[in-house]
Regions:
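Intrinsically disordered, low-complexity activation-like regions
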Residues: 1-94
Length: 94
């Protein structure tokens, strides 16, 4: 949940292509991506955090590791599945 707060309190993370930001986010959050456990009973905040982890953090990682073999499409696909769940499960997206 730390990522959720950090992400929404630092909107400069969203669209910047800044090496230091990419490095910081990658070092802090990329490894836990492989440990994500999906639970249909997760809260909205937990699900949104998982979407950020899956959809955004790999992009930051790939920018600082351009020769890595990560599959961004695979991560984004998982994030879109969680997004669909949120849309079905919750009436209010706030």
């Amino acid at each position: 949940m730390e990522l959720y707060e950090e992400w929404f309190n630092n909107k400069n993370y969203w669209f910047s292509k800044n090496f230091e930001i990419d490095k910081y986010l990658s070092n802090k959050y990329f490894t836990p991506i492989n440990n994500i456990i999906f639970n249909i009973n997760d809260s909205k905040k937990q699900l949104i955090t998982k979407i950020i982890l899956l959809d955004q953090i790999p992009r930051h990682y790939q920018r600082i590791n351009p020769h890595s073999n990560i599959n961004l499409f695979s991560y984004s696909k998982k994030a879109s599945i969680i997004s669909e769940l949120i849309l079905r499960k919750f009436n209010n997206l706030r």
